[in-house]
C-alpha cells in the first residue's frame, strides 16, 4: 500500500508531498496487526475502545490524507563528557483538518532526521478534537469552532480557546493558527499567558487545549 501525505517543511508552513510505502510494514503490536488485517477500519474505533497508538503506520493507514506542518527548527547544544554536542530540534504538527491533531518534537544531528522523529511522535500523539458552534452570537450548529471555553497549558504558556461566530477566523498567533487549522477549527478567539515565543510550549499548550475538548466531561 502506498499512501501520499502532504508534509510541510522549510520554509515554515510550506508544503511538499511524500510517498509512504506501507507494504513492507510488519506490525509489532496487537493494534497494528488488527489494523493491517482490516479488523479496525477507522481511527474513531481506536479512541472509542481506548486503544493506545504505538506505531505511526497505524495513522498512515487510517488517515491517509494527514497533513503535516513544520512549526520550528532550532540548533540546540547538549553538554556531554566529551564536550558540547550540537543537535537540531524540530517541532511538527499533524492533522486531517477534520477533528484530529497531534504535535511532536524530535532531536537529531541532521535536520531531516529531527523532522522525521518529530513527525513520528506527532502521529503517536494524535488525539480527537471535539468541535462545535459554542458562541452565543452564532447558532449555525456547524463544527467550525470549539463547543465551549477550554484551556491548555505547557511550561509557562497557557492558552484559552473561546468559541467564535462563523466568519471570525482564527484570532491567534501563527503557531496556534497552524495547530488549530490542522485540527479543523476555523473560527476561535484566544487568550494567552506566558512566553509564547517558545514554539514548543506554545504548540503543546494549544494541543492540550484541543485534547481537553474531547476528554472534558459535559
UniProtKB/Swiss-Prot annotation:
Residue stretches making up the S5 DRBM domain: 66-129
Record keyword rRNA-binding present: yes
Gene Ontology BP annotations: translation
Keyword entries, A-Z: Ribonucleoprotein, Ribosomal protein, RNA-binding, rRNA-binding
GO molecular function: rRNA binding; structural constituent of ribosome
Short name of any one Pfam family annotated for the protein: Ribosomal_S5
Sequence intervals crossing the membrane: none
Gene3D superfamilies named among the record's database cross-references: 3.30.160.20, 3.30.230.10
Matches recorded under InterPro entries: Ribosomal_Su5_D2-typ_SF, Ribosomal_uS5, Ribosomal_uS5_arc, Ribosomal_uS5_C, Ribosomal_uS5_euk/arc, Ribosomal_uS5_N, Ribosomal_uS5_N_CS, Ribsml_uS5_D2-typ_fold_subgr
NCBIfam families per record: PRK04044.1, uS5_euk_arch
UniProt remark on domains: The N-terminal domain interacts with the head of the 30S subunit; the C-terminal domain interacts with the body and contacts protein S4. The interaction surface between S4 and S5 is involved in control of translational fidelity.
Family according to the record: Belongs to the universal ribosomal protein uS5 family.
Name of this protein: Small ribosomal subunit protein uS5
Organism: Pyrobaculum aerophilum (strain ATCC 51768 / DSM 7523 / JCM 9630 / CIP 104966 / NBRC 100827 / IM2)
Protein's gene: rps5
Amino acid at each position: 500500500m502506498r499512501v501520499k501525505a502532504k508534509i510541510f517543511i522549510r520554509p515554515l508552513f510550506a508544503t511538499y508531498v511524500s510517498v509512504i510505502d506501507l507494504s513492507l510494514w510488519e506490525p509489532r503490536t496487537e493494534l497494528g496487526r488488527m489494523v493491517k488485517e482490516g479488523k479496525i477500519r477507522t481511527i474513531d474505533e481506536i479512541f472509542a475502545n481506548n486503544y493506545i497508538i504505538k506505531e505511526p503506520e497505524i495513522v498512515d493507514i487510517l488517515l491517509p490524507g494527514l497533513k503535516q506542518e513544520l512549526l520550528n527548527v532550532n540548533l540546540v547544544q547538549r553538554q556531554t563528557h566529551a564536550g558540547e554536542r550540537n543537535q537540531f530540534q524540530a517541532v511538527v504538527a499533524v492533522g486531517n483538518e477534520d477533528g484530529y491533531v497531534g504535535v511532536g518534537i524530535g532531536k537529531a544531528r541532521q535536520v531531516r532526521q529531527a523532522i522525521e522523529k518529530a513527525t513520528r511522535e506527532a502521529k503517536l500523539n494524535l488525539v480527537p478534537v471535539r468541535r462545535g458552534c459554542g458562541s452565543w452570537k452564532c447558532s449555525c450548529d456547524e463544527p467550525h469552532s470549539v463547543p465551549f471555553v477550554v484551556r491548555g497549558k505547557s511550561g509557562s504558556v497557557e492558552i484559552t480557546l473561546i468559541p467564535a461566530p462563523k466568519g471570525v477566523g482564527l484570532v491567534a498567533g501563527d503557531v496556534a493558527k497552524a495547530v488549530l487549522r490542522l485540527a479543523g477549527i476555523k473560527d476561535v478567539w484566544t487568550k494567552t499567558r506566558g512566553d509564547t515565543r517558545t514554539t514548543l510550549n506554545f504548540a503543546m499548550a494549544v494541543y492540550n487545549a484541543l485534547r481537553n475538548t474531547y476528554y472534558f466531561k459535559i
